[in-house]
Amino acid sequence: MKTMKLFCLMTLAITVALCPQLAAQVQTDVPQAVPGAKPVSVEHIKVHGTALEGNLEGDAADRDVFVFLPPSYAKEKSRRYPVVYALHGYSIGAEQWTHEIHVPQTIEGAFAQGAQEMIIVLPDSKTVHNGSMYSSSVTTGNFEQFIAHDIVAYIDAHYRTIPNRLSRGLVGHSVGGYGATRIGMKHSDAFGSLYIMSPCCLSARAAGSLKLGDEKALEAVKTPEDSEKLGFFQRAQLATAAAWSPDPKNPPLYLDPPMKDGAVQPDVLAKWAANAPLAFVDQYIGNLRQYRAIAIDVGDQDGLRMDAGKLRDVLDKYGSRTALKCMKARTRVRWPTVSRIM
């Protein structure tokens, strides 16, 4: 429980906002100034992802990363710090997310209120079609490996971290919550705690959710500029296909869409279903048992709450120490509320 408390203090420094294109259940308030809060240092760096090299859709292997260093970092030269890696959701990048969650003000306030000082890292995983799904694909590159190994290795090599898994937390919201779930299941060698917020895409997608109009819109996409003209959910289908049904023999997008010639493609949907964590969680229970703490957060009127509950139930069945918190539905989440649910 001590570890859970420490991890929750760590994640107190980070809260979330749903991307603006979606009907938001929660929004973050601009934080009030906390007496005695000291400024953190912000470094905007580029990290090369070996795992992303040669991806077919041309996404950059050099990724933007925002690193937030605690107030004592510059003065206490011999001190080392735990690290939290935070994964943004679909359609936004790391820089936009920092504005939506009011970083660095939130971090400064959390430290002033007693959260243990740590390094917080926000990597950018936005792609041609607005999101990598934090997965592994020849089309997008191996973002799973990039997060779990490339970035971790870089941060450990260039900053004064405590370089072991028990001093690393992985946090994500929405698609980032999916990423934290997926990567967390497969890479317990890299992280010691998981905090999963409103995770999407935990269960397989039903064929009935696909529309003929979407097929025609997707077929018209030949360039990244064409992709930018799509509606939110249409573009998300391209991102999903690029990540989960890549096809190196199908230019220019190098993916297989879920519909073709007016018909659902069952083989493609089977590939998508194979990437649903609820379908493969049982294979990684040994890894999940390695975590000191796993927490899941979701709104009590969030459409994602059922799948989040199912994930918690599976973990509980196997004896994993998992906390599930359901926030009361509201349009704004205030910081005292966030503090109480930690």
Each model region followed by its residue ranges:
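Bacterial N-terminal signal peptides
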Residues: 8-19
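Sec/Tat signal peptide C-region and signal peptidase I cleavage site
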Residues: 20-24
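Positively charged n-region of N-terminal signal peptides that target proteins for export
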Residues: 1-6
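Non-catalytic cap/lid and distal C-terminal segments of serine-dependent acyl enzymes
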Residues: 25-342
